[in-house]
Amino acid sequence: MVTVDEVRKAQRAQGPATIMAIGTATPPNCVDQSTYPDYYFRITNSEHMTDLKEKFKRMCDKSMIKKRYMYLTEEILKENPNVCAYMAPSLDTRQDMVVVEVPRLGKAATEAIKEWGQPKSKITHLVFCTTSGVDMPGADYRLTKLLGLRPSVKRLMMYQQGCFAGGTVLRLAKDLAENNKGARVLVVCSEITAVTFRGPSDTHLDSLVGQALFGDGAAAIIIGADPIPEIEKPMFELVSTAQTILPDSDGSIDGHLREAGLTFHLLKDVPGLISKNIQKSLTEAFKPLGISDWNSIFWIAHPGGPAILDQVEEKLGLKPEKLRATRHVLSEYGNMSSACVLFILDEMRKKSAEDGLETAGEGLEWGVLFGFGPGLTVETVVLHSVAAA
């Protein structure tokens, strides 16, 4: 008879979890950031608020965002004026949209599965993450049906985590892949701003910040350990993960589900809190590897906004090119909450291949991925870039 210890050993993978494929998707509706203030104040019937509109224009100008993608079109908003008001009861309307559209945007998974090159029947686990809406059965169930995954796929649904969750899903997928031999984990982050969109208020400027930054997008990755040679192509190994709540950060980023949808609250010192504490997270993550030069690693940081990136860059003395991929994704898509860091991974590996570099991590061996969000919570993931075949 076998022992429990022998069973446990047999269940575990030999190598580290690796990212084998990445896919992304956005709604077709693209909005230009330079013209967005005019559109936003017109569609919300707020053109009389001229001073506030000027403030919003400055926010959009400073956002470093060129364009964003949004499910909410002018037609949809005209049909649902309660979504355009500042705090009108509108949760039912919003829920009706996101319950359908969040899993549908998860079609990014189709791209990831295609790149992976294995039949979808080999997916053993699904981790689905969204801050857009809540439902039972969840978006994980709906996506399983949409993709035609096996009914026995082991699902984990994460709702209402916020912007740090791109790191959380990697942490969970790493544990699943390494502790279940042969596991292939499909991870999907799908975010739609239909839950947070609302008209302006001159008494709640933090809500306006969200209107200037957030965009819609979904990203999917396939994670597994012990890749099959010649069939699966590993890009990044997930070496270690950590999560922490920053000191003295209570209430710095909050979101509350109300009759008016998901409300967003932000303190001005968020960039300061992150930049003040980031060195500690880096030291704890990289000390075991003997790395202390933050310019010697590749960077994937959740782009909460340009001020966070600027202050992190300044605090750590990072060269401008270190946050190139991060700033590129912010510029092209805005802040897509949990999906952002996965978009940045995709951008980095594509540009690295384009430039003929030796690894998917800008030619470097080691890298870091940061998620920042409500709490204030920080997720840290140490990545090892696999040499290009």
From Swiss-Prot:
Enzyme active site: C163
Molecular function GO labels: naringenin-chalcone synthase activity
UniProt cross-references to InterPro entries, sorted A to Z: Chalcone/stilbene_synt_C, Chalcone/stilbene_synt_N, Chalcone/stilbene_synthase_AS, Polyketide_synthase_type-III, Thiolase-like
Keyword Oxidoreductase part of the UniProt annotation: no
Pathway info: Secondary metabolite biosynthesis; flavonoid biosynthesis
Superkingdom, taxonomy of origin: Eukaryota
Tagged with keyword Acyltransferase: yes
EC number: 2.3.1.74
GO biological process: flavonoid biosynthetic process
Pfam families per UniProt: Chal_sti_synt_C, Chal_sti_synt_N
Keyword annotations: Acyltransferase, Flavonoid biosynthesis, Transferase
Enzymatic reactions: (E)-4-coumaroyl-CoA + 3 malonyl-CoA + 3 H(+) = 2',4,4',6'-tetrahydroxychalcone + 3 CO2 + 4 CoA
Top EC group: transferase
Functional description taken from the UniProt entry: The primary product of this enzyme is 4,2',4',6'-tetrahydroxychalcone (also termed naringenin-chalcone or chalcone) which can under specific conditions spontaneously isomerize into naringenin.
Family (UniProt): Belongs to the thiolase-like superfamily. Chalcone/stilbene synthases family.
Protein name: Chalcone synthase 1
Lineage of the organism: Eukaryota, Viridiplantae, Streptophyta, Embryophyta, Tracheophyta
